Amino acid sequence: MEITAKQFPYNTGVVSRKAFDDHITLYDGYVNKTNEVTHVLATQPEYATANATAGHYRGWKKGETYAINGVILHELYFQNLGSEAGPMGAKTQNLINRHFGGTDKWKEDFIACATSARGWCVLAYEQRTATCRNILLDSHEDGNIATAYPIIVLDMYEHAYFTDYGTDKAAYINRFISSIPWVLIEKRVSVL
């Protein structure tokens, strides 16, 4: 099944228009690569040579999770780039209070997680233990928790912030947090 890229408006004070447009180009590449991987696996899987060390099938299957997670994580991230943060919703506030002991403690942990991440920082609800966690992904497919439901997604790859913030990760992270669209986050939390 072929996927198509979603359209995201530029409405953010977190990154410049140039950085946003460059980022959309990278996202479009993940969409295209997902479609290519899907096609190759459907038409040329080479099942007979599959093995755990290396090979055609293994390479394409590894690429499959990398590409589709690249699509999904970027879509969630672009949705998180809100220009009007507004107040945090009651359900979100209750969830953060219950699992982190308050907004300030969550924010401190989220900042530390994002600062430590090479790829992504995700506030996620992990279903197995019924716990909210800030999780760190060093790449699209490295660090995911299988039953985690993403609530807030922050791209920490250098391409996401370097154009506008250089090496000042803290400024990027703090600007992102101050711009979280809490109405959207409340919708995500309401399904839990």
Show the residue positions of the predicted features.
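Feature for soluble, non-membrane regions of globular proteins
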Residues: 1-192
